[in-house]
């Protein structure tokens, strides 16, 4: 196994599985932040200290891997090209911080890409568990298994009063971030998001774009996560998030039913216009592509568009990002060239899907 194995396909093996409410919740994630008591935390460490952390973790974990993680591969950021790191970010396998700002950053990736351990990110160790659909409980179970395995080899920085100690005070306590990636096109079309999203923030949750903090919400895709980690158990955090997400799922389904009942013709027109643009465009920028893909995904979920799998929309969301476009072009592309390549890739992928269905 090598880096090429993780860059070969836009869709990770875990994304191909079916999860609960997958027509609305694209994925679930649990992330655990941990530090080692014997080393300076990454935000204050020197390059020499960061190197010592990387070596210590690699020596402790690299040759064992255990049942929790399965067959895995250790990848060093310094050995990777900039575009390779960008592609791993686009697949949500590593964070932008690890790719761009880490000192001697590394990642240990499981074979199916559902589990990863980032080293020398904002914290010494960040464990991530991913699952298709609304599967926070399964993600938590998998993340905890990896956490137990890591802790059996390393000594964590832990305080009996405050819990796990982290670089950012907002992560102190459980050190856990639970999140879902959710598609809310009907709530956006019916202009209910302007009311709903501020209410979610008031409940102690955070709404972001699909690449986390600082990213823009595109294509009616939102990442919703907990904000508070201190004073709550991991199960409390998951339960709180699940309660809000279940309400969002119900509201999105009601909004979809309302559109079908009162605006079916207009909705169909919007869906097929977007499909037509994607299938026939020769230039399309990232924002428009994401917006049109959102419309088409809704059309597939509502049964308007047949013989097209919803998973190819998830695939195209990743394939049309700059890193993957440049990988397939085998060269650095200008923004204008990316728009041309993006349109060509979408045209070809939709044509292939149609021919396969026939």
Swiss-Prot record:
Ligand binding (ATP): 27-31, 92, 126, 177-181, 208-213
GO biological process: phosphocreatine biosynthetic process
CDD domains, alphabetized: bacterial_phosphagen_kinase (cd07930)
InterPro entries (UniProt xref): Arg_Kinase (IPR023660), ATP-guanido_PTrfase (IPR000749), ATP-guanido_PTrfase_AS (IPR022415), ATP-guanido_PTrfase_cat (IPR022414), Gln_synth/guanido_kin_cat_dom (IPR014746)
Any one GO MF annotation of this record: creatine kinase activity
Similarity field: Belongs to the ATP:guanido phosphotransferase family.
NCBIfam families the record matches: PRK01059.1-4, PRK01059.1-5
Protein's name according to its UniProt entry: Protein-arginine kinase
Gene name, Swiss-Prot/TrEMBL: mcsB
